[in-house]
Regions:
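Metal-dependent amide/peptide-bond hydrolase catalytic core
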Residues: 1-159
Length: 159
């Protein structure tokens, strides 16, 4: 029914940010707003981000040097026209934990073409209707291998 005030409220969600600083700011503001609204309404309120049991995913931020290396390797293999720079993703990604510990570059491969139902209907990777063009998989594997081989070739003496 409308206008009924519940005894208690509990809700959850996912927070995403392009930077770790942005995530910290979101957490700070959510806590301030929840506690402030509880105080205004003369009731108790609190926030539990469950950081002890479920660490927040850090932002995936490419290291500039590793990004330049990965892009150069991909362009060498595919040509400059075969590489597109995409906007930063808002997804929660395990790779952020790696990137926080060492210079890293996160990139994706295009797996659609004009004939796949995913491309025609704009189905994203989380859709049950998402279909990939499997011909892209060997190309993606080759790009990943080229990035690794080029890196090892350049840095073999320092390892």
């Amino acid at each position: 029914a409308y206008n009924v005030i519940p005894q208690s409220v509990e809700f959850g969600g996912t927070m995403r940010s392009m930077t770790d600083e942005g995530l910290a700011y979101l957490m700070k503001r959510i806590k301030e707003i929840v506690e402030g609204q509880a105080a205004v309404n003369r009731c108790g309120g609190g926030v539990d981000f469950m950081e002890e049991s479920m660490r927040p995913y850090p932002a995936v931020v490419n290291d500039e040097g590793m990004y330049a290396h990965a892009r150069a390797s991909a362009e060498r293999l595919l040509g400059a026209g075969g590489v597109r720079v995409a906007p930063q993703l808002m997804g929660a990604e395990d790779f952020g934990f790696y990137a926080a510990r060492m210079p890293s570059a996160f990139f994706t491969i295009g797996v659609g073409n004009a004939t796949t139902s995913s491309a025609r209907a704009a189905h994203t990777t989380h859709s049950p209707h998402f279909v990939i063009d499997e011909a892209a998989l060997p190309v993606g594997a080759a790009v990943h291998a080229a990035v690794a081989i080029d890196y090892l070739s350049k840095h073999a003496s320092s390892m």
